[in-house]
């Protein structure tokens, strides 16, 4: 195949971002080169998200927009991957609705991408290749990461929880853990390449190892990662509150490398709604867990996910969510208005909340959380933090940016030769979404 260029469009979560790094690695191992923009590419791949129907609609819009490029360049090859094709009806609808699409593949058969592209480019076939069941985890697939000091490492795939609002178990499959040694070897290689921080990825990292021989648990994996020389920081996401065990908390508390930050999605503060969501814990359990973690790790910061307007949510239920937010005092929160997700049990539930009520509630929640976030950031003024310098600030290229161990973004003046180093920064101003500081 003559040298061709590629362009990847990524929608969705960090798992998708990492999948796009894998797609890029596969393409470059085949001789493709990255294109700076989609209009100059020979191959465009859209890596899709299906967690919400609004995300799907964005993808459909984008595919439609690419029709013009295909008219201008009939040799352009367009493919769709990710979570959307894992829904069989949607995948077939894509091919019918968008005749300019050349191929579709799913999350489970990413390793088959070279064969799919050979069929498209060499045999000029139109390909729909989506495995509905999970295959074995394939190791050794090349990954093309952006240069930097932080890297994402997938430790497991899929989810067994089947929360009633969530499509993920249906499109990502059941939980499958990577072998511990494969994960450790990948991290050692990343350190050799100059990365100094890794974030471990999984839909529920606390379930890691339950499907493996010998059942090496998440705490054991963390303890072994801690021993890797040259690695400075470790983070992980996402943690399901029900599965966050005491041994993980103990490893975090005793670690020099695991950062004092937990993303602990609560989703709702009402026991009635938590039960309807099939979350597997109560409000009281969650608050006790937070208290237990803070007792062991006093400087820990918490972030969360919250859904507003779930079917059956009353004003009393919503007030319980607000009360929980006041009690926990999250550093930040990802807040979402509930929207029906076709294919999930919640979409069929009665007592759907009116849109105007959901809009009012989400604004009330955002105002409460923003007030807490700003207050916590203001409390940092005068404190000195160790910052891993990541690069130039995205909002002010004259400044550098990095993160505290508690995952707060800090912007400060400094020379570019500090990128990739640990520095001490005194916080001068706490703002809503970041901190300002000076080198000390």
UniProtKB/Swiss-Prot annotation:
Q: What is this protein called?
A: tRNA-2-methylthio-N(6)-dimethylallyladenosine synthase
Q: Where does [4Fe-4S] cluster 2 bind?
A: 159, 163, 166
Q: What's the source species for this entry?
A: Carboxydothermus hydrogenoformans (strain ATCC BAA-161 / DSM 6008 / Z-2901)
Q: Where is the TRAM domain?
A: 378-440
Pfam name, any one? TRAM
Subcellular location, record wording: Cytoplasm
Q: How is the cofactor bound?
A: Binds 2 [4Fe-4S] clusters. One cluster is coordinated with 3 cysteines and an exchangeable S-adenosyl-L-methionine.
Q: What class of enzyme is it?
A: transferase
User: What gene does this protein come from?
Assistant: miaB
Q: What is the lineage of its organism?
A: Bacteria, Bacillati, Bacillota, Clostridia, Thermoanaerobacterales
Q: Give the catalytic activity.
A: N(6)-dimethylallyladenosine(37) in tRNA + (sulfur carrier)-SH + AH2 + 2 S-adenosyl-L-methionine = 2-methylsulfanyl-N(6)-dimethylallyladenosine(37) in tRNA + (sulfur carrier)-H + 5'-deoxyadenosine + L-methionine + A + S-adenosyl-L-homocysteine + 2 H(+)
Please describe the quaternary structure of this protein: Monomer.
Xref: SMART domains? Elp3
């Amino acid at each position: 195949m003559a040298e061709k260029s590629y362009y990847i469009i990524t929608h969705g979560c960090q798992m998708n971002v990492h999948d796009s790094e894998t797609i890029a690695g596969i393409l470059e191992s085949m001789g493709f080169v990255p294109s700076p923009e989609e209009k100059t590419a020979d191959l465009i791949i859209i890596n899709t998200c299906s967690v919400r129907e609004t995300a799907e609609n964005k993808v459909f819009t984008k595919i439609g927009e690419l029709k013009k490029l295909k008219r201008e360049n009939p040799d352009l090859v367009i493919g769709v991957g990710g979570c959307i094709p894992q829904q069989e009806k949607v995948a077939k609808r894509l091919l019918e609705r968008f005749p300019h699409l050349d191929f579709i593949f799913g999350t489970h058969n990413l390793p088959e991408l070279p064969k799919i592209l050979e069929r498209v480019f060499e045999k000029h076939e139109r390909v729909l290749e989506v495995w509905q069941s999970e295959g074995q985890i394939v190791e050794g697939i090349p990954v093309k990461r952006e240069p930097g000091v932080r890297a994402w490492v997938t430790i497991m795939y899929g989810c067994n929880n089947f929360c009633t609002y969530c499509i993920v178990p249906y499109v990502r499959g059941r939980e499958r853990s990577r072998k511990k040694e494969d994960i450790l070897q990948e991290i050692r290689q990343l350190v050799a390449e100059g990365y100094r921080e890794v974030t471990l990825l999984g839909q529920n990292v606390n379930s890691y190892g339950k499907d493996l021989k010998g059942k090496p648990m998440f705490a054991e994996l963390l303890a072994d990662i801690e021993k890797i020389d040259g690695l400075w920081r470790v983070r992980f996401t996402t943690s399901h509150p029900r599965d966050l065990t005491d041994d993980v908390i103990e490893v975090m508390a005793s670690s020099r490398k695991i950062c004092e930050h937990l993303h602990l999605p609560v989703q709702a503060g009402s026991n009635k709604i938590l039960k309807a969501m099939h979350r597997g814990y109560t409000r009281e359990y969650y608050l006790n867990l937070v208290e237990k973690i803070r007792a062991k790790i006093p400087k820990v910061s918490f972030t969360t996910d919250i859904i507003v307007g779930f079917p059956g949510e009353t004003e009393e239920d919503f007030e319980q969510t607000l009360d929980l937010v006041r009690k926990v005092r999250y550093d930040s929160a990802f807040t979402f208005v509930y929207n029906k997700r076709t294919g999930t049990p919640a979409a069929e539930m009665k007592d759907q909340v009116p849109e105007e009520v959901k809009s009012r509630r989400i604004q009330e929640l955002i105002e409460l959380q923003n007030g807490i976030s700003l207050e916590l950031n203001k409390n940092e003024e005068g404190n000195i933090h160790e910052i891993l310098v990541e690069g130039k600030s995205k909002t002010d290229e004259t400044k550098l940016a990095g993160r505290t161990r508690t995952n707060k973004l800090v912007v400060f003046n400094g020379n570019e030769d500090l990128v990739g180093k640990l520095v001490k920064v005194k916080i001068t101003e706490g703002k809503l979404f970041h901190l300002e500081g000076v080198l000390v």
